[in-house]
Each structure stands twice: as C-alpha cells, then as structure tokens.
Amino acid sequence: MSGKLKITQVRSLVGRNEKHRRIVRALGLKRMHMTVEHTNNPAIMGMVKKIPHLVTVEEV
C-alpha cells in the first residue's frame, strides 16, 4: 500500500454535492485537469473511493 498516487480531477464540481466538493478540495485539487501526488494511505484512498466519478487515479 506504500507508494504514490497521481490524482487528476476529470469532472467539474458544478452542481455536485457539498461533501464531494470538500473532498476534492481536501485532496488539493482546485480546477479541472489539475493533478496532485499523494502518498498511498487509507485516508487518501477513502477520499478517492467516495469520488471515483470526479477523479482518475494512477499509481506512480
């Protein structure tokens, strides 16, 4: 489970649930097609699993 994840926002937040918006912001994503790197840990994976329709995830 160690390693890094590249998380990219691929869908807009317009009209989305406030909880989903907060999760995207907590991941550090501010706009469409922005990519961030995070360590692969249960907290990050939990956030990603709640918004799979808004982001893509790649292992680095």
UniProtKB/Swiss-Prot annotation:
The keyword S-adenosyl-L-methionine does not apply. CDD domains: Ribosomal_L30. One of its GO terms (molecular function) is structural constituent of ribosome. The keyword Ribosomal protein applies. One of its GO terms (cellular component) is cytosolic large ribosomal subunit. Transmembrane segments: none annotated. It comes from the Bacteria. GO terms for biological process: translation. PANTHER family: LARGE RIBOSOMAL SUBUNIT PROTEIN UL30M, MITOCHONDRIAL RIBOSOMAL PROTEIN L30. Part of the 50S ribosomal subunit. This is Large ribosomal subunit protein uL30. It comes from Desulforapulum autotrophicum (strain ATCC 43914 / DSM 3382 / VKM B-1955 / HRM2). The lineage of its organism: Bacteria, Pseudomonadati, Thermodesulfobacteriota, Desulfobacteria, Desulfobacterales. The gene is rpmD.
